[in-house]
Amino acid sequence: FCLSRGLGDVYKRQIPYIEKLVRELKKLLPQVQIWLGGPEVSFDAEKVMEEYPQLTGIMLGEGEQTFLELAQHYRSGESGEEALSRIAGLAIRKNGKVILTGPRVLTDLSVIPFLYDDLKKFENKILYYESSRGCPFRCSYCLSSIDKKVRLRDLSIVKRELQFFLDQKVAQVKFVDRTFNCNKKHAMEIWEYLLQHDNGITNFHFEIAADILDEEQIRLLNQFRPGTVQLEIGVQSVSYTHLRA
C-alpha cells in the first residue's frame, strides 16, 4: 500500500521517475496498492489509468479530504471496488473498466488545520503557506486554469498564523498561492500586516502577476526592509499573441 507524498503527488518534472517507479514497484511488490494524485494525472485520469495497469487508482483534484477518506478506508480493513466507489474524487477500476466516483466538493481553506505548531520538525527548512487557492486567469498552457474559482483563507486566521512565524523568527515563508495578488484587497492586507510586524529576520516569497501590480501596491512593497519580500514573476512568453492564447 503506497500513499507516500513522494509517489502520491505528481507534477510534470516528476513524471519520468514516477513512471519507472510505478512499474518497478509493482514487480517487486505485486500486492502493493499504488495511488497517484496531482494536476498532471488528474487532468486525464482515465487515460493514465489505461496506460498504467499497475495503478490502483488516482486521487482527482484537491486531495486533503480524499486522501483522508482513502487512508480511513484502508485502515478499516474494508476491501473491494464497491467500497472504494463510495469515496468521491477518485478514478478507480470497477468490473474491468475505469470509472470516476464523482466530484469532490471544493475545500474550505479556512477549515484546513495549521500544521506548523511544532517547528522542531521543520528546523532550517523553508516553510510553505497557502492563503488562497485557484487562479482567475484562463491561460491555455497552464493547469491552474482548471481551478477557475479563487478561494481565500480567512484573513484573521492568516494573520494569526503569520504572527506565529514572525514570533518564532522563521527564516523564510514561501506562499504557494498560484497568483498571490489576483485579489488586491487580500494581498494588500497581508502585505500591510507583514510590514507593520516585521521582525527583522523573516522573509516572505510570493508568486505574483506583475502586469496587475498597480502604483499603490508598488509603493507599499517599496516600504519593506530590503530582502523582506521576494517576488516570483512567471515570464511565460515575450509574445503577446502567445500570452493571449
Annotate each language-model stretch with its function.
Residues 103-109:
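A short, sequence-level motif marking secondary-structure junctions
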Residues 1, 15-16, 42, 181-185, ...:
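Loop/helix-junction capping segments adjacent to catalytic residues or to phosphate/diphosphate-binding pockets
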Residues 5-102:
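Glycine-rich beta-alpha loop elements in corrinoid/cobalamin-binding modules
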Residues 20-23, 49-52, 73-74, 106, ...:
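Short, glycine/charged-enriched secondary-structure capping and boundary segments
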Residues 110-244:
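Radical SAM [4Fe-4S] cluster-binding motif and immediate context
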